[in-house]
Amino acid sequence: MMNWNTLISAKRFGLEEFHQERHENRSEFQRDYDRLVFSAPFRRLQNKTQVFPLPGSIFVHNRLTHSLEVSCVGRSLGTDVAKAILARQPELQNSYLPEIGSIVSAACLAHDLGNPPFGHSGERAIPTFFSEGKGMALKEQLPAAQWEDLTHFEGNANAFRLLTHQFEGRRKGGFVLTYSTLASIVKYPFSSSLAGKKSKFGFFTTEEESFRRIAEELGMKRLNDDPLKYARHPLVYLVEAADDICYQMMDIEDAHKLKILTTGETQDLLLSYFPEERKAHMLKTLDFVSDVNEQIAYLRSCVIGLLIQECTQAFLNNEERILEGEFEGSLIKHISELPASAYNHCADISLKKIYRSRDVLDIELAGFRIISTLLDLMIDAVRSPEKAYSQLLINRVSGQYNIKAPILYERIQAVLDYISGMTDVFALDLYRKINGNSLPAV
């Protein structure tokens, strides 16, 4: 069984030999949070699509606002869970357990850092390029494990790479975050050879030893050696729950603002989480609020509060199984019947009316095309760097990416690092320039 005393560590990745905890107002895990907020990759999230196209006159969520909101919910989940565990096991009071809220909050901030531009279509475009597109020509030139990495490219694994990899000119250890924050980000703690049809995995072959080091230090349960697989770090369940709560609620709220859902439909969806007595009380409160968007915001906040309670209880009810590495599914799948039914109904409505709406499909089509084109040109450039046009493209890439590495797989990874780090706006601008549709001002 995994142990809370070892699962939570302030040791920093890349600074293991120099680890010395500072006794200041900020804990080591709060430092993780601040370090992420002040980073360039985090700032770039403001120009990355969440679901809907980046805003015109109506402001909807982007990756940045989504990550901040997930972080807030994650902090509440972590704080509530820590409080309950300490009531059960007061001997843990002098451990790092009271810091769970800060750890989960920091991990939530970082959970989408590895996602490419243009939302889910951008993330799908990368593995599709290798499994169905021109990238298929590379299969015979790469070892099987590296090929699996490419054909199952996953934003979560890419986030772990971004946070731990030593890019050119940067310090060892990447962001140099604490072991526990890093482990809490990895939803799928196994290699790409176990990715399966869902294409989910937690680390590329280049970062496998880094993850192994972290997992062994924290005492995470190893399930398999080759291919490598661990049970999740328990705090991953809280990060996942915060994400599940936020994307469902915020997509509904955004759909209302964009008039994809009517006010009546939205109110009914949000009220369906509650029993009749609570529902009647909430409707009375709505009588005092005349602004329709504020009414929806109030109902949304009530649902989020309820789901935080439900997921907290689900974690506590299953703590032993989670620590044994035997818990299956997400916490949201283990909540009470009424909110579970309402959540599933919201998910169905989101699929039918939101994710298949014209605006969402248009941005997915454009994003897929843009990412595929950039990949095609950049991969060809690193395969044939001697060509004149290849040199023009390669010289366009920031020096932090090892685009001229002697090993082909490392050059391909540099291309993926470069493209996945782009904002929607930057990727679109580069696409237009490459196609001759936009010329720089002279």
Show the residue positions of the predicted features.
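A short small-residue
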Residues: 48-58, 349-354
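Substrate-recognition/cap regions that form aromatic- and gly/pro-loop-enriched pockets
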Residues: 316-398
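Sequence-structural signature of the catalytic-core scaffold of metal-dependent phosphohydrolases
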Residues: 1-25, 37-48, 57, 68, ...
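C-terminal amphipathic alpha-helical interaction region
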Residues: 384, 391-439
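Hydrophobic alpha-helix feature that most strongly marks membrane-spanning transmembrane helices
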Residues: 246, 250, 254, 308-320, ...
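Low-complexity, highly charged intrinsically disordered N-terminal segments
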Residues: 61-65
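Acidic, low-complexity proline/glycine-rich segments
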Residues: 31-43, 335-341
